[in-house]
Amino acid sequence: MNKNDSQTGRVRIGVAGAGKMGNVHIRILSELDGLFDLVGVYDPIPERAEIAEKYRAKAFHDFDAMLREVDAIVLPCPTSLHKEMALRAADKDVHVLVEKPIAETLADATAMYDAFEKKGLKFTVNYVERFNPVVRTISDLAPGLDMVSVEVHRCSPFDSRIYDVDVVTDLMIHDIDVVVNSIFKAEPEKVKAIGRYVYGSKFADYAQALLEFAGGAAAFITASRCTEDKIRDIQIHAKGAYLEGDMLRRTLVVKRGVTYEDDANPKINYTQSNLTQQIVLQDKNPLKEELENFGKAILHNEELLNSREQVMRTMSVLDRVEYALYGRRG
């Protein structure tokens, strides 16, 4: 940690962007007061920055002024601003957690990581589902599964506040990250995608992606912001096993095929049934877990659970899905 609140041993942190996601970060950071000292909130719209007063923090109307008073920042601002604002933070020796996606291009993402690593600063991206207990448990179980296919659905009603990105960057990116980093831990060999424009002609509001991996296993990912329900589910089909998870309700069921030989009756070679196991998961807030990981990485040099390799893998596959949809980056 380059700069430190030496009196309290906490990370002095600010939030740059007080929109929908920014408000969530602000609230949770205020709850983690044993780890973070929420110094302030910056937003170019002055009235939005005033949310800081609710948490006894300072409203900043100048980003660089906030950088001078903090050890770290969270950047829940538009993707187009990520590179510029992150590099300004790195220049002031400030650690950064940035919202997904990391940047508009792979080249920008590389430049951002290089800048922070050169200065020995912590830098990570908010792929919050990686901290979901359903995903963490599936990640632990995945190496022992003879995988056939994975199906993931992330569906929501239309939100008029999301106007600058398509459904792949807005929603599907979370499940791309889960599939390539928590389940297969590899980049797919082939990527295909289809999409539908529902609420406008600029961005797809519904998309399906097919990721084909070495060995023949596949992942089917559906993302929708035109579904009149909120769905966050995952199904895994494997040889002798089936897993069904709900990332919203944080439940996971594992069903395994069980074969019994009947020694008493040689005419019956076996009977077959399913063993169903309801996995007991810890009820933890994934974003709180992620922010704790960020804070402990700064204070105690603990490993960031979203690594550079993983973030770049997700970004690469995101680009491939966008290209399959549009013939270009979306």
Where are these regions (language model features)?
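C-terminal helix-rich "cap/oligomerization" subdomain common to oxidoreductases
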Residues: 1-10, 72-75, 214, 293-330
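Beta-loop-alpha module in the N-terminal Rossmann-like domain of NAD(P)-dependent dehydrogenases
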Residues: 25, 55-113
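A contiguous active-site-proximal alpha/beta segment in oxidoreductase catalytic domains
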Residues: 103-162
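Rossmann-like dinucleotide-binding domain that binds NAD(P)(H)
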Residues: 159-229, 233-235
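NAD(P)-dinucleotide binding in Rossmann-like oxidoreductases
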Residues: 217-290, 307
